[in-house]
Amino acid sequence: MITRGLMLALACSFLVLAGCRSAPVMNVVDAPVGVSRSAQQVEQAIVSAGNSLGWQMRPMGPGRIEGTLLLRDHRAVVDIDYSPRTYSIRYKDSSNLHYDGGTIHKNYNGWIENLDRAIRNRLT
């Protein structure tokens, strides 16, 4: 009886710990640029911020940049839409981050927070 209870407790603990590894996907939507900037200045700030953190930033046309972060065997890809007034960072693709339609490995959100912070710092 004790063995069965112990097995059940271990199984529940494993499920709880496994669930802690994922979190809802974080997107940054319409973050204000702040002071008046041109679209080119906003693009330069985004590219500079991403590059400083190891992101590969690739302009995809007016108002859009694709950012790719490669860490060990993980890959995160985001679309960054911007204007002179706002910018948005949205999930696009990933590998080895256990993306499941709305949740992803918890480290992803930290990478997005760092990117957002670096962009904001360059725009102030």
Predicted regions, residues:
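Bacterial N-terminal signal peptides that target proteins for export
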Residues: M1-M7
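Generic detector of short alpha-helix boundary/capping microenvironments
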Residues: M7-L8, S38
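Sec-dependent N-terminal signal peptides
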Residues: L8-F14
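C-terminal motif of bacterial Sec signal peptides marking the signal peptidase cleavage site
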Residues: V16-G19
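Ser/Thr-rich, low-complexity intrinsically disordered terminal regions
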Residues: R21-T124
